[in-house]
Swiss-Prot record:
Pathway: Polyol metabolism; glycerol degradation via glycerol kinase pathway; sn-glycerol 3-phosphate from glycerol: step 1/1. The gene is glpK. This is Glycerol kinase. ATP binds at residues 12-14, 265, 308, 312, 409. ADP binds at residues 12, 16, 265, 308, 409, 413. It comes from Thermoanaerobacter pseudethanolicus (strain ATCC 33223 / 39E).
Length: 497
């Protein structure tokens, strides 16, 4: 009887493999970084062969590290950096170009063209996304337009496209299976999230042949089996979801209105909206959360560009702290920020403002302002930005948030989590296992093979490490938030010519 599930967590900077047991505990984990390629300013690439090599290397290594046999693994679940695009030759299995990474801005001119034609409104309606170089559609077009002979080969059916999940599954099955899941497909900008199929009109506009696209399947499903030559046995590949959606699943956000926030360099916030695709009027993305149990569920997504990165700025540029955990210690030394607000709009502001010309600001300074006040105000800015996004989510969905589940590096900061709860006026829950992305992929795989029987069973695995209850009265909460809104106004449009 197989006792474990293995997750592949293929991220932007590293490939990781984690082995989980039935209670969702980590048995072993292994991680390997790979090369970031920057051919020109604003361009970012990865070598798909290196991604495959590092991912299979950590998978074999983690089995050894855990001291188990490949036969002990019931299934593999895959989660991945979203939007990153690979095009390869069907016959040789070799990529015709490096993977174009989600961060890469090279296709901005193609996006501008779509906007100038007014085609962006159509894309927004059909895919739930804004037209941006971030998503896969324009990256595929760029490869077909710029790699010699690519378009002819694609039209003859000799080329295949995939995001990283598709590329890994194709290699694990030695080319037998060309597939993706609903959550990853919903980030390509060419998938109709209402009709649940590749959109012929968008494909025609971008001149992408449909035969190069993978089949789209549920997120919890046996797609195929690993080729025997890889692990010595055939293991079912049974779960697939983009990283942020996998984290939503790993956090057991199964009901409409449940939300999670991942506090990393930036923040990614997703709210489950159930079987209803909620269009956003506030600059959020409408996306597929997952496809499971014969239906698709949707989410609203908002991203904050600068969160944990603001704490790094205090450490590396201002040098007023020596390490990130120290920020909590200093923030606790003062009762408040003494009227100081920091707006960390270092690269503009994301949802719900979408102001590329906003710049970082410190306001409310007086002669009594100390280092502690600036540090505390920087931490508080992460919580204020989270409230901005959540207010937008509540406005779009009409659903009131009951509690916020948190994960990611900065969720370890107790001061920040308590202030987050205070400023939202809702409880904040930090789980014991914060590797929620890999956990979500494991759950999806385990459900498909009967390792777990239901979402209810999974929910029982979700345990709170720390629960934060709001301790601030409403009058104070609203007064502080009003001050934040004023500070944001001062930061907006600053860099406009």
């Amino acid at each position: 009887m197989a006792k474990y599930i293995m997750a592949f967590d293929q991220g932007t900077t590293s490939s990781r493999a984690i082995i989980f047991d039935r209670s969702g505990k980590i048995i072993a984990s292994l991680n390997q970084e790979f090369k970031q390629i920057y051919p020109k300013a604003g361009w970012v690439e990865h070598d798909p062969m290196e991604i495959w090599g590092t991912q299979i290397g950590v998978a074999k290594g983690v089995i050894e590290k855990a001291g188990i046999n490949p036969e002990d693994i019931a299934a593999i679940g895959i989660t991945n950096q979203r939007e990153t695009t690979v095009v390869w030759d069907k016959n040789t299995g070799k990529p015709i170009y490096n993977a174009i990474v989600w961060q890469c801005r090279r296709t901005a001119p193609i996006c501008d063209e779509l906007k100038n034609k007014g085609f962006d409104k159509k894309i927004r309606e059909k895919t739930g996304l804004v037209v941006d170089a971030y998503f896969s559609g324009t990256k595929i077009k760029w490869i077909l337009d710029n790699v010699e002979g690519a378009r002819e080969k694609a039209e003859k059916g000799e080329l295949l496209f995939g995001n990283i999940d598709t590329w890994l599954i194709w290699n694990l099955t030695r080319g037998k299976v060309h597939v993706t899941d609903y959550s990853n497909a919903s980030r390509t900008m060419i998938f109709n999230i209402h009709e649940l199929k590749w959109d012929k009109e968008i494909l025609a506009e971008l001149n992408i042949p449909e035969q190069m696209l993978p089949e789209v399947k549920p997120s919890s499903y046996v797609y195929g089996y690993t080729d025997k030559s890889i692990f010595g046995v055939e293991i079912p590949i049974a779960g697939d979801a983009g990283d942020q959606q996998a984290a939503l699943f790993g956090q057991a956000c199964f009901k409409p209105g449940m939300a999670k926030n991942t506090y990393g360099t930036g923040c990614f916030m997703l709210m489950n909206t159930g079987e209803k695709a909620v269009p956003s009027n506030t600059g959020l993305l409408t996306t597929i959360a997952w496809g499971i149990d014969g239906k698709v569920e949707y989410a609203l997504e908002g991203s904050i560009f600068i969160a944990g990165a603001a704490i790094q700025w205090l450490r590396d540029e201002l040098r007023i702290i020596d390490n990130s955990p120290q920020s909590e210690e200093y923030a606790m030394k003062v009762e408040d920020t003494n009227g100081v607000y920091v707006v960390p709009a270092f690269v503009g502001l994301g949802a719900p403002y979408w102001d590329m010309y906003a710049r970082g600001t410190i306001v409310g300074l007086t002669r009594g302002a100390k280092r502690e006040h600036i540090i505390r105000a920087t931490l508080e800015s992460i919580a204020y930005q989270t409230r901005d996004v959540l207010e937008a989510m509540q406005e779009d969905s009409g659903i009131r948030l009951q509690a916020l589940k948190v994960d990611g590096g900065a969720s370890a900061n107790n001061f920040l989590m308590q202030f987050q709860s205070d400023i939202l006026g809702v409880p904040v829950d930090r789980p014991q296992v914060i590797e929620t992305t890999a956990l979500g992929a494991s759950y999806l795989a385990g459900l498909a093979v009967g390792f777990w029987n239901s979402r209810e069973e999974i929910e029982k695995n979700w345990n709170v490490d720390k629960h934060f209850e709001p301790a601030m009265d409403n009058e104070k909460r609203e007064k502080l938030y009003k001050g934040w809104k004023k500070a944001v106004e001062r930061a907006m449009k600053w860099a406009e010519e």
